[in-house]
Amino acid sequence: MRCPFCGYEDTFVIDTREIEDQRVIRRRRECPNCKNRFTTYERIEEKPIMVIKKDGRREPFDRNKLLAGLQRAVVKRNIDNEKLEAIIDEIIANIRKQGISEITSKEIGKMVLEKLKDLDAVAYVRFASVYQEFSSLEEFAKLLSQMKKE
């Protein structure tokens, strides 16, 4: 690999580690010419997941968009971002395990609700109210009564 500092053609690897659940390889390299060190990452290039929106549009899955929705649902709850990231990782893994490249936003919403149900009831209700587009107090009451039965 070419050195980013001096352009020398032949650098060598001094350390290799697997990170992110063995899905990424991190390599520390050194240039024999200028002695500078740098890091490279090797990742599997995965087929992008396309999300089919309610209106039929298709757009690439956006992890940050889902994270923002989860963060809104857990505002002022004692839930850290690591748990939210783990939920997203599980959802992505589930989609990939199914071997599909397209999924509806509705299906993603259902997956999120299943994860939030186990994590935090308030976050679950908040997310459900947006996901299911509640427009009245009766819809909230219905959801809460269903939750009490379960």
Swiss-Prot record:
Residues 49-139 form the ATP-cone domain. It comes from the Bacteria. The keyword Repressor applies. GO terms for molecular function: ATP binding; DNA binding; zinc ion binding. One of its GO terms (biological process) is negative regulation of DNA-templated transcription. Pfam families: ATP-cone, Zn_ribbon_NrdR. Its cofactor is Zn(2+). A zinc finger (unnamed) spans 3-34. PROSITE patterns: ATP_CONE. Binds 1 zinc ion. HAMAP family: NrdR (MF_00440). PANTHER family: TRANSCRIPTIONAL REPRESSOR NRDR (PTHR30455:SF2). Negatively regulates transcription of bacterial ribonucleotide reductase nrd genes and operons by binding to NrdR-boxes. This is Transcriptional repressor NrdR. It comes from Dictyoglomus thermophilum (strain ATCC 35947 / DSM 3960 / H-6-12).
